[in-house]
């Protein structure tokens, strides 16, 4: 597994829609394909315009598909809510 940090900027007023999907059964099933959810840490900016997740990824291709719009489950919601995202690989020191 690889530790990855994802920072996403959300379209204005779309935080609740984003989190609704991420917590839904459909969203959780897709996220399980990517990472160990028991090791996921998340936070949100005070104005709810950005989210950050540290995830323990076991399928990087699925992660990229989930984020870039090529996953048919996440695409409709991410087209609606996502402004941009950045992915960082984390290394323990």
What are these regions (language model features)?
Residues 77-79:
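Short, exposed beta-strand-loop hairpins at the edges of beta-sheets
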Residues 1-73, 83-93:
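Short S/T/G/P-rich N-terminal loop/turn motif that feeds into the first structured element of a domain
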């Amino acid at each position: 597994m690889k530790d990855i940090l994802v920072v996403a900027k959300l379209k204005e007023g779309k935080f609740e829609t984003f989190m609704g999907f991420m917590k839904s059964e459909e969203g959780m099933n897709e996220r399980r394909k990517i990472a160990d959810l028991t090791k996921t840490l998340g936070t949100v900016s005070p104005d709810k315009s950005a989210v950050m997740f540290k995830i323990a990824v076991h399928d990087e291709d699925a992660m990229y598909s989930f984020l870039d719009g090529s996953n048919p489950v996440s695409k409709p919601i991410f087209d609606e809510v996502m402004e941009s995202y950045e992915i960082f690989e984390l290394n323990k020191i």
